[in-house]
């Protein structure tokens, strides 16, 4: 079963450095886990949509909650989906 999760957070460090770090580490792992999505950042605030299998998305969101690069993480939306909106 596929799900889509949308969350917002604040960058713990300057956003440009944080985005580079997140992308460098997450892109290969997300591909291995079958996770797709989109990350948007402005004024030190992140908004990200994550899509994939329920277990993989839930696990990744748990990692994000524990990630020191994110502060004030807020879950905005979570739904079951039949197809991805953001493909690799």
Regions found by a protein language model. Name each.
Residues 1-88:
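Charge-rich, low-complexity N-terminal segments
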């Amino acid at each position: 079963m596929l799900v889509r999760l949308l969350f917002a957070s604040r960058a713990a460090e300057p956003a440009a450095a944080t985005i580079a770090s997140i992308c460098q580490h997450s892109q290969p792992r997300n591909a291995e886990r079958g996770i797709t999505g989109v990350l948007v950042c402005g004024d030190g605030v992140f908004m990200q949509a994550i899509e994939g299998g329920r277990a993989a998305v839930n696990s990744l969101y748990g990692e994000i909650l524990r990630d020191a690069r994110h502060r004030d993480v807020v879950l905005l939306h979570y739904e079951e989906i039949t197809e991805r909106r953001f493909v690799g």
